[in-house]
Amino acid sequence: IPVTGAVIVTTPQNVALMDAVKGIELFNKVQIPVMGVIENMSTHICSNCGHEEQIFGTGGGDLLSEQYDIPLLGRLPLNVQIRENADAGKPSVAAGDANAVNYMAIAEKIARALPKAEKDKSRIF
């Protein structure tokens, strides 16, 4: 299966952003288009009270998006419901939980970008 593009997934903290930058630069070097960035664990949502806070910092995905001129595809929270559903064999979208909308929005952005991506069927990496 030919590689059409890469999606960078990072957390907003600086140490993770350094790894994400290495990934972006590697994909650029081997001419694999970076289709966008996803900020994982963007916020923490307390399972008891619903309070939301940014325990890993803020703006990391935005920074990468601006610095490398790639779209910010979305943000995903650090939420116990995501793990519980995955452990039960039902990812958020299949379970229809509150996080499903975030995953669907990201998937739709990637799907819209795919036809625009240049395809090189001769390469697999």
Regions found by a protein language model. Give the residues of each.
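C-terminal lobe/tail of nucleotide-utilizing enzymes
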Residues: 26-125
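Inter-motif core of Ras-like GTPase G domains
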Residues: 1-15
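Active-site glycine- and acidic-residue-rich loops that bind
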Residues: 14-17, 54-55
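Ligand-binding clefts of soluble mixed alpha/beta catalytic domains
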Residues: 7, 23, 28
